[in-house]
Amino acid sequence: FDNKSFIYLILGFFVCGWHISLIATHIPVYINDRGLPEWCTVTILSMIGLFNIFGTLTSGYLAQKFSKKLILSVIYLTRGLVIAVFIFSPPSTFMAIFFGITFGFLWLSTVPPTMGLVGFIFGTKYIGLLYGIVFLSHQIGSFFGAYLGGVFHDLYGSYDYAWYISIALSIFAGLIHLPIIEKQVKRLQTT
C-alpha cells in the first residue's frame, strides 16, 4: 500500500461502486418520486444493461490505445455531468431514457482501464490479489451507495443529497486518477 497510484485506483473504484449501487438500488423509487411512469424504471435499467456492453468494449479498446488514467478521469467526470443533467432537468421520459443510455455506456467502462493499470503497473503475477483489493473498494463503495441512498431518502424524503455526493465523488474520482504514474514498478530481484 505504499504505491500512491495503487491507492488512487482503490479510491476511484470506490466511487464506481457508489454510483453502480446507488442507481441500481434506488432508481425505481427515484423515478416514482419524480412522477414518471413505472415503465421508465425498466427502460432505464434495460438501457444500462444494453449500453454497458458497448461502453465496456469501447473503454477496453481505448485503454489499449490511450492513457488509461485519462480514460478513467474522463469516465468519472462524464458520470458526474450525466448525473447533474439528469437530476437538474425537469422530469421527463426522454431524460430518463437519456440517462439510461448514457450512464449505461459509462456503467462498467471503468473496469478495463482499472484492471489494465493494475496489470501494467504491477505486472500480472499478483494481478488477482491486487485487483481483488481494488475490487474490494468497489464493493465497499457499493455498500455505501446503496445504504446511504436509502438513509438520505428516509431522512429527507428525497435523494438530493445522495445525488450531490455522487456528483462530488465523480469530480473527486476524475481528479484522483490524474496523478497516477503509468509506468511499471521496479521489482526486487531475488537470488
What kind of region is each of these model predictions?
Residues 31-32, 62-63, 148-157:
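Interfacial helix-cap and linker-helix signal at transmembrane-aqueous boundaries
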Residues 2-61, 145:
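Extracytoplasmic gate region of multi-pass secondary transporters
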Residues 151-169:
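A membrane-interface helix-boundary motif in multi-pass transporters
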Residues 46-52, 58, 63-117:
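C-terminal transmembrane helical hairpin of 12-TM major facilitator-type secondary transporters
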Residues 118-127, 157:
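Paired intracellular helix-loop junctions of major facilitator superfamily
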Residues 38-39, 124-134:
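Loop-to-transmembrane helix entry/capping segments in MFS-fold secondary transporters
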Residues 165-191:
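Multi-pass alpha-helical transporter architecture, strongest
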Residues 14, 46-50, 77, 132-140:
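Transmembrane alpha-helical cores of Major Facilitator Superfamily
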